[in-house]
Structures are given as C-alpha cells and as structure tokens.
C-alpha cells in the first residue's frame, strides 16, 4: 500500500492528471518495452506529416498521459536517437522535432514559474545536444525548480560568475574523473553545484 501511495504522489507531482492517475491505477497497466515502442511509433507517424501543430498536439497528449521522466526517457529520447541513426530520415524532420521539443521545454519552464519553487541555473558541460539540455531543464522544472538555462554548452563552467546561485551541470553522461574533481573543488569553494543526470 505504501508503494501505491508513493506512486500516486509521484504521478501527481509530475503533472499527470487526476483522471489519468486513477485510470492507470485501476488498470494497473505496466508499461513494457513493447508499449513504449508502439508510442514511439505513434510519434514517428506524426513526424512524417511534417506538421508542427500535429506534433505539438501529440507531445501535449503524451505529456498529459505520462510523467515527464517517462516522456523524456521512454518516448522523446528514443525517437530522437532513431531519427539520428536513420540514413533515410531527412534532417529537416529531425530539426522540426527539435524545434517543437525546445518550445515544449520552454513552455514547461514558464509553467513551473507559476508555482512555488527554488531558482537554479542549468549549464550544459562539454555536451553537444542543445535540445536535450532544454529537455533536462523541463525535467528539473517538473521537480519544482525554476530553471534558467545557459543556451550554449560550456567547455569550462565558471560558477564564480554566478555567485549565490544554485547550479546544475549536465553532460549527457556520467561525469569524467576530471569533471568530478572540478565539481568537488567548486563545492569546497562554497559553490552550490550539483551534477544533474
């Protein structure tokens, strides 16, 4: 029962509607890899229409039905990976998706500012995927943070330029030993810097 209560709290906190939470709990539907694959295929089908409005609507539908973590990890990221690996995929479609995803992330950031929360800065560190950086900002926003984003990833973050601010750094992978050493050094200097993964 405690696990069930925790699941309800997690779903509600992540923004899943009350009706959807009730439906998920009544059905006790467990999302399997096959379920995620069919949802990913739905998104690929909508992408083929090359319609930003249809794509925004589908992402909005998925957002109402799934927690932000699940949406990013099980739908958006796999679809983006498929598009980047598919030699037949037109770069225009991948770029269209990224544009809609950034718009989605920015809307999530704006929505989070309407609620109580703490301010933080998100910095991409030695990473190339700007779109995923914005998705990670949306993920943090769903966890109650008011996130500001440095739009361009930085090779060498300088927390001293942002005194007194809470800083999250994101690399898209586990920190290297050098990055971990720098994180520890910054913390020793009194900066509030966390690795976001």
Regions found by a protein language model. Name each.
Residues 1-33:
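Basic, Lys/Arg-rich alpha-helical nucleic-acid-recognition elements, primarily the DNA-binding modules
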Residues 9, 40-48:
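Amphipathic alpha-helical repeat scaffolds
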Residues 19-21, 73, 150, 196:
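Residue-level detector of family-conserved "landmark" positions at structurally sensitive sites
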Residues 27-28, 79, 156-157:
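Short secondary-structure capping/turn micro-motifs that flank functional sites
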Residues 35-37:
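Generic helix N-cap/helix-start motif at coil->alpha-helix transitions
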Residues 51-106:
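Helix-enriched interaction subdomains in cytosolic or periplasmic regions
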Residues 103-197:
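C-terminal regulatory/effector modules of DNA-binding transcriptional regulators
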């Amino acid at each position: 029962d405690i696990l069930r209560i925790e699941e309800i709290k997690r779903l509600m906190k992540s923004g899943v509607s009350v009706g959807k939470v009730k439906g998920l709990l009544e059905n006790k539907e467990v999302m399997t890899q096959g379920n995620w694959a069919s949802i990913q295929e739905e998104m690929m089908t909508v992408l083929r229409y090359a319609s930003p409005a249809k794509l925004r609507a589908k992402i909005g539908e998925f957002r109402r039905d799934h927690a932000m973590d699940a949406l990013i990890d099980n739908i958006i990221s796999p679809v983006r990976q498929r598009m980047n690996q598919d030699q037949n995929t037109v770069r225009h479609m991948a770029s269209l998706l990224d544009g809609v995803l950034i718009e989605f992330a920015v809307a999530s950031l704006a929505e989070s500012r309407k609620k109580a929360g703490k301010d933080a800065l998100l910095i991409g560190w030695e990473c190339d995927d700007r779109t995923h950086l914005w998705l990670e900002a949306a993920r943090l926003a769903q966890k109650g943070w008011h996130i500001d984003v440095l739009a361009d990833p930085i090779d060498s973050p300088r927390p001293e330029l942002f005194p007194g601010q809470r800083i999250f750094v994101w690399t898209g992978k586990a920190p290297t030993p050098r990055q971990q050493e720098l994180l520890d050094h910054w913390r020793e200097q009194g900066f509030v810097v966390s690795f976001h993964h």
